[in-house]
UniProtKB/Swiss-Prot annotation:
Keywords: Chloroplast, Plastid, Ribonucleoprotein, Ribosomal protein, RNA-binding, rRNA-binding
Gene Ontology molecular function, alphabetical: large ribosomal subunit rRNA binding; structural constituent of ribosome
InterPro entries: Ribosomal_uL14, Ribosomal_uL14_bac-type, Ribosomal_uL14_CS, Ribosomal_uL14_sf
Protein's UniProt name: Large ribosomal subunit protein uL14c
Gene3D superfamilies: Ribosomal protein L14 (2.40.150.20)
UniProt organism field: Bigelowiella natans (Pedinomonas minutissima)
Superkingdom of source: Eukaryota
Subcellular localization: Plastid, Chloroplast
Record note on quaternary structure: Part of the 50S ribosomal subunit.
Amino acid sequence: MVQPQSRVKVVDNSGAKEIVCIRVLGKGRNQLSNIGDIIIGVVKEAIPNTPLKKSDIVRAVVVRTRKGLKRKNGIYIRFDDNAAVIVNKENNPRGTRIFGPVARELRDKSFMKIVSLAPEVI
């Protein structure tokens, strides 16, 4: 789960390396996000000479969490890190590559562009 003040690794080539979550969209008072939720974050670490700079405010989709996720068939899926992909207002990724696996639940939440760019869908 990702909540406000959580540090999240960015797994695309948009230029940011790490963001800090400041808001979870669509959750109301319960500010806990899971895989497929959109968060608002601030770039804390960025690669030089890229469009995203430190202290930029961005939208991102959570693609991996350390918290276990139970599927309908009874399988628990868990990742080693909390990771997100930076998206624009239309929920299309800003980068052109995605690094590492993403969860199959993104397909159910209609993030097909992210699923198609990912090297592995678990």
